[in-house]
């Protein structure tokens, strides 16, 4: 059972998404608190009054004094809610790693009060839904603040030029993964925005003919939850250059260069794939951690064994873009996979691939696969030399 600490002040606050039973009588003996998966019954005549004070503003002692209820009762209820993962207990503020702070003390002191800062107010409103995800991670007690702060320090590179890649780029930026960038794959056939790039809502007809990468980077400052000033603007303000993230993830969308993937494997870079399979199927995964999980070549060899040929070629005129509804779904699923790995270090896509059938998109299938005996991805260096 989870118990409250007596050394650190506790400021109880219900997690975003916990619902409370409606009051049906002025003489209640208990209330029920629940989510869609489980619930807790609090048996106390003043349970509703106590829960109403769980806003993160007052400490346990202050709530006890305000209501005239023994501190032991307050802590007992807190312990029940902590055991159900219904409660946050820490007060923290988001650290904006890339928000400019003047080196001049008088100006720095002036900017500390952000109550009238329209940009900061907008950030708070956009941040609330993201915090409501992070707060539910097991063990999180600060409302998801540390989770969101950590996202700013994680680097993601998306390699691709499809609508799915553009959508994924915008989702990760809007989710607080500030250090997300998009790189064109070696198969990129047009450096400018063309008709096939439209339809996702990210790029418009007025963008046709513009440099694709430059235009997407311009829009990134609108999409990003934590916008980053341009390098030129930072230099003008005398701000330090952004620090290159220590943790990184590569997401390969669409066709890819096998030599580039070999480079990722050799250098130990985590990566996963998003693409299209033959027929009416889109795929998310596998997620590859070099030296620990089967790689993309393992999957290719397994598929070749099943089909009976080493490789299938794509006929001329075949569109490699996904239907727009599927593109949105696949981008969202890929973003979920990336965010879970960033937030927790875990993913269900290791040695697995998520299959999304265009004609049965409401039933994605997670298919697992083993290492292929002919693939050397998990061999030791001594085995390779032999």
Give the positions of each predicted feature.
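Adenine nucleotide-associated cytosolic modules
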Residues: 1-386
């Amino acid at each position: 059972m989870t118990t409250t600490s007596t050394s650190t002040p506790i400021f109880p606050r219900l997690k975003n998404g916990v619902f409370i039973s409606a009051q049906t009588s002025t003489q209640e003996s208990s209330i029920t608190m629940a989510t869609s998966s489980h619930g807790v019954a609090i048996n106390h005549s003043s349970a509703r009054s106590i829960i109403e004070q769980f806003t993160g503003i007052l400490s346990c002692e202050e709530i006890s004094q305000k209501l005239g209820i023994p501190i032991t009762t307050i802590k007992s209820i807190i312990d029940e809610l902590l055991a159900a993962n219904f409660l946050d207990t820490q007060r923290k503020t988001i650290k904006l790693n890339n928000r400019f702070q003047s080196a001049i003390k008088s100006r720095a002191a002036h900017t500390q009060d952000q109550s009238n800062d329209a940009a900061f107010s907008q950030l708070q409103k956009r941040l609330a839904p993201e915090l409501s995800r992070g707060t539910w991670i097991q063990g999180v007690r600060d409302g998801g603040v540390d989770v969101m702060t950590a996202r700013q320090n994680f680097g993601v590179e998306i390699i691709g030029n499809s609508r799915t890649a553009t959508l994924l780029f915008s989702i990760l930026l809007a989710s607080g993964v500030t250090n997300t960038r998009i790189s064109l794959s070696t198969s990129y056939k047009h450096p400018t925005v063309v008709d096939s790039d439209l339809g996702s809502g990210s790029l418009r007809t007025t963008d046709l003919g513009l440099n694709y990468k430059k235009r997407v980077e311009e829009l990134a400052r609108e999409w990003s939850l934590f916008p980053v000033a341009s390098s030129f603007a930072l230099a003008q303000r005398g701000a330090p250059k952004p620090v290159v993230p220590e943790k990184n993830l590569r997401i390969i969308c669409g066709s890819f260069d096998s030599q580039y993937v070999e480079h990722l494997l050799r250098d130990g870079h985590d990566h996963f794939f998003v693409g299209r399979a033959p027929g009416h199927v889109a795929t998310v995964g596998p997620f590859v951690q070099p030296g620990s999980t089967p790689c993309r070549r393992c999957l290719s060899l397994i598929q070749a064994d099943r089909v009976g040929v080493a490789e299938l070629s794509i006929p001329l005129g075949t569109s490699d873009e996904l239907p727009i509804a599927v593109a949105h779904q696949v981008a969202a699923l890929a973003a979920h996979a990336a965010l879970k790995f960033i937030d927790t270090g875990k993913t269900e896509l290791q040695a697995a691939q998520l299959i999304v059938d265009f004609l049965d998109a409401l039933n994605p299938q997670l298919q697992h696969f083993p290492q292929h005996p002919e693939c050397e991805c998990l061999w030791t260096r001594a085995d390779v030399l032999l």
